[in-house]
A protein has these predicted regions:
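Loop/turn elements at helix/coil->beta-strand transitions in domains of secreted/extracellular proteins
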Residues: 29-34, 64-68, 95, 134-139, ...
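Active-site nucleophile/metal-coordination loop of metallo-enzymes that catalyze phosphate/sulfate
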Residues: 25-29, 43-134, 145-163
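Secreted, luminal/periplasmic, and some membrane-associated catalytic domains
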Residues: 53, 79, 100-116, 122, ...
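Substrate-binding rim/cap in mid-to-C-terminal beta-strand-loop elements of soluble/periplasmic
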Residues: 343-385, 451-493, 507
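A long, amphipathic alpha-helix that forms part
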Residues: 45, 234-259, 272-313, 489
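Beta-strand elements within well-structured catalytic alpha/beta cores of enzymes
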Residues: 30-42, 61, 87, 129, ...
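Bacterial Sec-dependent N-terminal signal peptides
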Residues: 1-28
Length: 507
């Protein structure tokens, strides 16, 4: 005879055991993820200034973390906005739509910036965390810069904070929840900027250069009292301290990491040249920036460790994969170089197309390294876009300094491994019909907008580092790409990766 009571009791005990196991597994998920992007971080500088670091910042990350020293972005070109967007979405501009900090609106033919989460075409890791927890997770992003804050916050975040270029106040977007009280109460730079002075953090940092030129150097002193004072301040070594203080205030005020529901804090630091000057004009400033950043990372990690415990937190650190363009005088040293005038070339191209098909404004405009064809005109003349771009490509390839020319048709239809990075950086709705690549050492100048871009194909080495929960100290020399960061975090906190992410987790 079957003992139904015994079976029922067995089923109950088995289910209870499964629930306990599931609960234990869930408890292992990090309570907090801290995603740190360091704008223009370079591994060679990171190593060069190592004698100046303490034990709790960069050294703690490199010695105790899971380090991937050979990281890269799987698309080109890269800037701060596109890099941060790629980290948070786990994909490239061809899917997330962030082709750069600025692009041309095809309707108005005017530049637009990514100052709204609506610019993102896909979900971020923060968005997916909000969905997975029914909105219970706390998600914030903090950066000196608007684009980085918004691109890392995503659509569903509680908020994003950055320093306003005009007022110096920590501000946010109306897209998110109403201003948090703790952010409103946080002091702005408005009343104190004139009293701030940036000098070397120590005599050693201020008097001895660890750059290749090396040796003794004069210390620097900078005040912030011009019309551009807040913009300049955001590129100095002091700004990272403000970011760290606000990040700690955010975690404290919102009780991040204090319960079993995972929270996410995205932070952007700055490690580029002061006021975007050439490196030879700000070597000591850059050295000081790295040393101060080392102290700020140590302060952040210590605060997290004391309040939550690093074993319950996943910290991710990476760079943005580019640096400010350096106006190197190649001509002086007889290195091949030159200037490609985009606006002049566009006019010549328009004349060439006019000779083929009759007079008309075939070229609507040009922007960055892109040329935009007048679609309405070629349609009225019954000329296909494929034909117009092909003819344009053939003409432009004959110009001095042009290394390659890509057409929108080519990037959308061909699956050529050699074009992979260019294809991944192309988003049809926000890019031109023709993309020009000039030879290394050449620069593109648009005299109409007074903008210039330089061509340098060399690789900027930077790391991806994980510290804390689910990681052990180890160095992985295998080259990896940054689109694998988001799925790695998603796996660690047991949620879906962002909806356009097709890359595998790093571990």
């Amino acid at each position: 005879m079957i003992d139904h009571k015994h079976i029922s009791l067995s089923v109950i005990l088995t289910m209870a055991a499964f629930e306990m196991a599931a609960g234990q597994e869930l408890a292992q998920a990090p309570r907090l993820v801290v995603s740190i992007s360091i704008d223009q971080l370079r591994s060679d500088y990171l190593e060069a200034f190592a004698p100046l670091y303490g034990e709790g910042g960069f050294k703690r990350l490199l010695n105790n973390g899971l380090v991937y020293p050979n990281a890269s972005y799987p698309f080109t070109p890269v800037d701060r906005a596109s890099a941060v967007a790629s980290v948070s979405t786990g994909t490239t501009p061809s899917y997330n739509g962030i082709v750069g900090g600025r692009w041309l609106n095809k309707e108005t033919l005017r530049p637009v910036t990514c100052d709204s989460p609506g610019s993102l075409s896909v979900s971020t890791i923060g968005d997916e965390l909000k969905v997975a927890t029914g909105g219970k997770s706390v998600v914030y992003a903090i950066s000196p810069f608007c684009d980085a804050a918004i691109m890392s916050a995503g659509h569903a975040a509680n908020g994003a904070a950055w320093i306003d270029d005009r007022t110096g106040k920590w501000t946010s977007s109306s897209f998110y929840s109403p201003y948090a009280g703790w952010l409103n109460a946080y002091s702005s730079l408005t009343g104190v900027i004139s009293a701030k002075e940036w000098t070397p953090i120590s005599d050693l940092v201020g008097n001895f250069s660890y750059f290749l030129s090396g040796g003794l150097s004069k210390p620097f002193k900078h005040k912030f009292n011009t019309e551009r004072k807040f913009i300049q301040y955001k590129t100095c070594g002091l700004v990272n301290s403000d970011v760290t203080s606000l990040a700690i205030q955010c975690m404290t005020s919102t009780s991040m990491g204090q319960d079993a529901v995972t929270d996410l804090l995205s932070i952007t630091y700055y490690a580029g040249n002061y006021d975007h000057k050439p490196l030879n004009e700000c070597q000591m400033e850059l050295q000081d920036t790295y040393v101060r950043l080392d102290e700020d990372i140590a302060r952040l990690l210590n605060d997290i460790d004391q309040r939550i415990g690093l074993s319950k937190v996943m910290v991710m650190v990476t760079g943005t994969g580019y640096t400010d363009e350096d106006n190197a005088d190649y001509e002086k040293f007889k290195i091949p170089s030159g200037t490609f005038y985009l606006n002049r070339t566009a006019n010549l191209l328009n004349m060439y197309l006019g000779a083929l098909w009759g007079q008309g404004q075939y070229i609507e405009t040009c922007f960055g390294r892109e040329v935009f064809i007048n679609h309405k005109l070629i349609e009225s003349k019954q000329i296909s876009l494929a034909e117009a771009t092909k003819r344009s490509q053939e003409f432009l390839l004959q110009m001095s300094g042009v290394r390659n020319v890509y057409t929108s048709q080519q990037l959308l239809s061909e699956h050529n491994p050699q074009l992979a990075k260019v294809h991944n950086g192309f988003f049809a709705e926000r890019c031109g019909d023709i993309i020009i690549e000039v030879a290394p050492g050449w620069k593109i100048i648009n005299e109409n907008t007074q903008e210039s871009t330089h061509s340098r194909a060399s690789y900027i080495q930077f790391p991806i580092i994980f510290l804390g929960a689910a990681t052990k100290a180890h160095k992985v020399e295998t080259p990896v790409t940054t689109d694998r960061i988001a799925p790695t975090i998603a796996k660690a906190i047991r949620i879906r990766a962002p909806n356009a992410c097709m890359s595998e987790p790093l571990f």
